[in-house]
Amino acid sequence: MPPRDAVPTSTQVSGIGADGVQTEKVLKNRPKASALRQQKLPAWQPILTATTVIPTVFVIGAIFLPIGVFLFIASDAVSEFTVEYTNCLSPCQLQINLPNAFDGDVFLYYNLENYYQNHRRYVKSRNDQQYLGDLTNVKDCAPFDIDPATKKPIAPCGAIANSIFNDTFTLAHRADTGIVTMVPVTTQGVIWNVDKDRKFKNPPLNDGNLCDAFNNTTKPPNWSKNPCEVGGFENVDFIVWMRTAALPYFKKLWRIVDRTTNPLFSNGLPQGTYILTVENNYPVQSFGGKKEFVISTTSWAGGKNSFLGIAYLVVGSLAIVLGVVFIVIHMKFGHSMNELSNVSEIHH
C-alpha cells in the first residue's frame, strides 16, 4: 500500500452530459491526504484541576510580587524635579530649590502635554530620504514641501520638521554667597547612535560651506534661522524632535549635565538654589497644551515611572488572592482525589 502522501492530487469523476454522452471531469485541486493538510495532527489539551491551577496561580504571584517591588524601589530612587513655565513671559526666570543632591548623571528634559504627535497625517508628513542629504526629495511632505513664493524645496520638509520645539534653556547654580555658576551641559549621549549614523546626514559640502549646500532650498515657515546655521539635518534638537511620541503627554531629552568641566558638578547637581532662564518661544495655548522643564536622574530601570512596578504588584497580589480563593472553594466544594479515582473506576 503506498504512503498516504502518495495519493494522487487529481481525481476523475464520471457523469452524463446534456447530449447523453458520458464525460469525465478531472478534479485537480484535491489536497494531499497528509495529517497536516487534513487537519488531523495530534493535539493535547491540559486538564485544569485544582492541583495544577492553584500552584500555578501562586507561582505567578510569587514571581510578579518581587519584580514589582524591585521596579518600584528603582523608580522611587530616581530624583526628579519638574517646573511648569507655560505662561511665563519670555525671557522667563524661575527659581528652583533642589531639596537634595542629584548624584550621578543628570538629564534635562522638556515636557509637552496635550500635544498629539501621533496624528496620522502629522506622522506621515516627512521624507527620510531628504534627511539623508537628498535636498530635492520632498515627497509626502505636503503642505510643507515647496515654498509658494520661491518655488524652492523646503529643507527640512514636512509638518514634523516645521513644528520643531524651539524653546531654549539655561540653568545656573546660585551659592549661599551669591555666586552664580552656569551649569555646563552637553549634547553627547542625547541622540541614539542609529539616528546619528544612519538616519540623518547633511548633503555634500561645497568648499566646506554648509549654507552653500542648502543654497537652492528654503527654510520651513516656522523656523527663525536657516538650517545651515544650526547644523542642518544633524542638529541634535532636530533629530530628537523627529522621533515622534506615541502619547499626547511626552518627555524629550534636551541636554545632559557635563560633569567633566567644573568640579562643582563632578558628582551631579548639588543641593541648593538654581535659576532657570527660558526663552519661551513655542506656542501651546491654542491647543490647551502645557510645557514643563524636568531635571532627573536615572536608575537601572530607566527614569522615574512607578506605573510598571505598581502594575506588577497589582497582578502579583491578585494572583495570590485568587490562589487563596481557589483553595477555599476547593476545600468547601471540591472533590478529593479518592472520589475522583472512584468515579473513574465506575465509568471504566
Swiss-Prot record:
**Which PANTHER family does its entry note?**
CDC50, ISOFORM A, CELL CYCLE CONTROL PROTEIN 50
Q: Which UniProt keywords apply?
A: Cell membrane, Endoplasmic reticulum, Endosome, Membrane, Transmembrane, Transmembrane helix
Which protein family is named in the record? Belongs to the CDC50/LEM3 family.
Q: What is its main location?
A: membrane
Q: What happens when the gene is disrupted?
A: RNAi-mediated knockdown results in the appearance of abnormal vacuoles in the intestines and defective recycling of endocytic cargo with the accumulation of cargo within abnormal early endosomes.
The record's Gene Ontology cellular component field reads: early endosome membrane; endoplasmic reticulum; Golgi apparatus; plasma membrane; recycling endosome membrane
The entry's localization annotation reads: Cell membrane; Early endosome membrane; Recycling endosome membrane; Endoplasmic reticulum
Pfam families recorded for this chain?
A: CDC50
Question: What topology does the record note for this protein and the membrane?
Answer: Multi-pass membrane protein
The record lists the membrane-crossing segments as 53-73, 309-329
Q: What is the role of this chain?
A: Probable chaperone protein for the phospholipid-transporting ATPase tat-1. Regulates cell membrane structure and function. Plays a role in maintaining the membrane phosphatidylserine asymmetry and the formation of the tubular membrane structure. Involved in membrane trafficking and is specifically involved in the recycling and degradation of endocytic cargo and this is likely with the phospholipid-transporting ATPase tat-1.
Highest taxon, organism lineage:
Eukaryota
| UniProt protein name | CDC50 family protein chat-1
